[in-house]
Amino acid sequence: MSKQSLSYKDAGVDINAGNTLVERIKSDVKRTTRPEVIGGLGGFGALCALPSKYKDPILVSGTDGVGTKLRLAIDLKKHDTIGVDLVAMCVNDLVVQGAEPLFFLDYYATGKLDVDVAADVIKGIADGCVQAGCALVGGETAEMPGMYHTGDYDLAGFCVGVVEKSEIIDGSNVKAGDALLALASSGPHSNGYSLIRKVIEVSGIDPTTTQLAEHSFAEQVLAPTKIYVKPVLQLIKHTDVHAICHLTGGGFWENIPRVLPSSVKAVINEKSWEWHPIFKWLQEQGNIDRYEMYRTFNCGVGMIIALPQEDVETALALLQQVGEKAWVIGKIEHANADEEKVVIC
């Protein structure tokens, strides 16, 4: 009796599906390209030259995911914007140090490859790369039977940028008297989603039918993370930016001290900006205390920028020109070593 001849497909890995996906995404990848990119998809490694305008270039790298926002995206079958979130979480961390993102790579892992879903996700990644001005130069699609539940997938992103060595922003120039400028967020971005999902569970709502501020809750909670690269690079060009804080996991309490010298503190007026409606809903439905809100969520603020008071008017005008909502939310003050680095009052 002859034995059955087994194939990789019999084991759950469909190489043809992977090849189909590559063909599907080529046009999306192409629209992200930069002049520095050498070659196209299909190589073992991606090649990229440094932009010639840099005299003493320093590479800046970052990697991130989208946390359990992905669980909601999968459950609500909304796959076309989660890739924007993935890019945003990486490139926003790079621009904090003054870096221009150059190229991006993604990792997409699943138990059984659904070409349509994967193509939607990668289209979103390409959209994010276009917004950030970086090239999608490659990635890995891993089909791993037995590793994920049916329909589930996971994402990771990797980005490299470049900054002139003399123009690195590291917070060392922050001084008492600097103004704190806040850039509005589009919602929770990609942080706090385990708590969001718990509040949804406790409240018993249906995200697809519940309305919140003239939009469905699902639209609000899955709104893609804002990509601040282009407006922030313009601010850096036209004002004297001393520090930039990307409000991610840990919120205000954890992230702001990362960009401040030990001799100062950030004093923030919580009445100076608008909370996005979803945060008010979360606080009410989850009975979440004030400290926890500021520790878990961005509460309507995606980035905070420290700069001299004399540059505030220029910065606000520039941001208005490019359609970014911004507020002056506080200032930098002297602090003793044992004082809290963030005061919200």
UniProtKB/Swiss-Prot annotation:
Lineage of producing organism: Bacteria, Pseudomonadati, Pseudomonadota, Gammaproteobacteria, Pasteurellales
HAMAP family for the chain: AIRS (MF_00741)
EC number(s) per entry: 6.3.3.1
Subcellular location: Cytoplasm
Primary site of residence: cytoplasm
Oxidoreductase as UniProt keyword: no
GO molecular function: ATP binding; phosphoribosylamine-glycine ligase activity; phosphoribosylformylglycinamidine cyclo-ligase activity
UniProt record, GO biological process: 'de novo' IMP biosynthetic process; adenine biosynthetic process
UniProt record similarity statement: Belongs to the AIR synthase family.
Superkingdom field: Bacteria
Alphabetical UniProt keywords: ATP-binding, Cytoplasm, Ligase, Nucleotide-binding, Purine biosynthesis
Pathway: Purine metabolism; IMP biosynthesis via de novo pathway; 5-amino-1-(5-phospho-D-ribosyl)imidazole from N(2)-formyl-N(1)-(5-phospho-D-ribosyl)glycinamide: step 2/2
CDD domains recorded: PurM
CC per GO annotation: cytosol
One of the Pfam families matching this protein, by short name: AIRS
Protein name (record): Phosphoribosylformylglycinamidine cyclo-ligase
Reactions accelerated catalytically: 2-formamido-N(1)-(5-O-phospho-beta-D-ribosyl)acetamidine + ATP = 5-amino-1-(5-phospho-beta-D-ribosyl)imidazole + ADP + phosphate + H(+)
